Structures are given as C-alpha cells and as structure tokens.
A protein has these predicted regions:
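Extended, low-complexity cationic-aromatic segments
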Residues: 14-96, 192, 199-207
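Short, basic/hydrophobic alpha-helical segments
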Residues: 93-112
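Active-site proximal helix-loop segment of RNase H-like, two-metal nucleases, encompassing DDE(D)
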Residues: 82, 151-173, 184
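Acidic/histidine-rich, metal-coordinating catalytic segments
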Residues: 109-121
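Short beta-strand segments
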Residues: 31-33, 112-115, 139-141, 196-197
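C-terminal domain-tail junction helix/linker
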Residues: 3-6, 173-208
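RNase H-like polynucleotidyl transferase catalytic core
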Residues: 58-63, 132-150, 166-168
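Short Lys/Arg-enriched helix C-cap and helix-to-coil transition segments
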Residues: 1-13
Length: 208
C-alpha cells in the first residue's frame, strides 16, 4: 500500500540516502537492511494444473498452514549481493545479529547502513553496536518512504520467485528454499539495480 510521507524531515532524510547511492566514495560499502516478515509456509492441498493453450496455470485455493518465518536481509548496493538469515522472530536481538553478519561479510573499509524507522532499528542495543563499530554509520529513510531502501527491490523479487507460487510442506522447507535462492541470486551475472529516482530540486551535475 502506498502512503504519502508526512515526515517533517522527509527531504533531509531522502537526500541523505540518495547522496549515498550517488555520491558515496567508491571504496565505502552501502548496505540496505530490512526484515521480510510474514513469509508463510503454505502447502497446497492439490498440485497446480499445468498451463494449456489459451489457459493459464490453475491453482487449488485450499492450503495447509505450517507457520511463518522472517528473512533478516541485507543488500550490498554496489555489488548486487544479498545476505541474511531466516528467523522465527524479528526484534532488536535479531537485528543486531544482522548487523554482526553485515560486519563479518564486509570486514574492511567504512560502510553505511540504510534502513527504515522500525523501533527495533534504533534501540540502545543498536546504538551500542554502532558505538563499538565506528566504521559503520546508520541512515534512516523517511517515515512511509521505505521505497528508498533498495533491499525492497530484492524482497519483491524473492516474493515473486519463491513465495507467490511456492508450496512448502514445512517451515524447514521454506527456510531452505529461501537460503538456496539467496545463493542463486548472488551467482547471477547481473548488474546492480539501476537507481533512477532523482529529486527535481537537485542540479543534474550533482549526480554525474
């Protein structure tokens, strides 16, 4: 659902994130973080009926619920690489675990995290982590503007390729399928997402 952002600091936060995408030094990491919550392990009670000429795939509407999982995910903007882990919970502890994983995956150089305003992203534990890891800095998107976070593009792809038409007989199968997809995604010789949003108020030369 689209919501217009009424954040009083919208422009300042937006420009802060966009300057990372367009102007951050090339040797600095830009890592987008978020949680993909509510991934349902739905098992279809009957197999899909194959596509035929003039007729799309047909799917039985009945399914068995096996629970939900959450992907704690990170996306390296410049390298087009996904990393993360699947969890049954999403809270401050799991977010700090994600920060630890990002730090392990990128052991050298300065870096920037982009994330939304979920309360778990701005707790004392997170602030303590940032204080203990001064080479990393945190950048928040404006309220109701998570579309500025490039990991949402990756999450959308995961949803279409893995979840929408998937049938999972257990949480373990869903977990494994998501894990396998991250490996497949990173192995593809595709370029990073081509980010095109540029505020009209910005001089074009600033983005070249």
């Amino acid at each position: 659902m689209w919501l217009t952002s009424h954040d009083d600091e919208f422009r300042a936060k937006r420009d802060d994130v966009l300057r990372l995408y367009y102007e951050a030094p090339p040797d600095e990491h830009i890592i987008c973080l978020d949680e993909k919550t509510g991934m349902q392990a739905l098992e279809r009670k009957h197999p899909d009926l194959a596509m035929r000429c003039g007729q799309p795939i047909r799917r039985e509407f009945e399914y068995i619920r096996h629970g939900t999982l959450c992907l704690m995910g990170g996306y390296n903007v410049r390298e087009r690489k996904l990393f993360g882990f699947v969890s049954e919970d999403h809270d401050t502890d799991t977010f700090v675990d994600l920060l630890d994983l990002a730090d392990t995956c990128h052991p050298e150089g300065r870096g920037h995290f982009v994330c939304d305003n979920l309360s778990a992203h701005n707790t004392d534990d997170v602030l303590d982590w940032l204080e203990d890891h001064p080479r990393w800095s945190m950048h928040f998107t404006p309220k109701h503007a998570s579309w500025l976070n490039q990991i949402e593009c990756a999450f959308s792809i995961i949803g279409r390729h893995v979840l929408t038409r998937g049938s999972f007989c257990s949480l373990a199968e869903l977990r494994q399928r998501v894990h396998d997809y991250l490996l497949w995604f990173n192995a593809q010789p595709a370029p990073p997402f081509k980010w095109s949003y540029r505020p009209k108020s910005w001089p074009s030369a600033r983005l070249n």
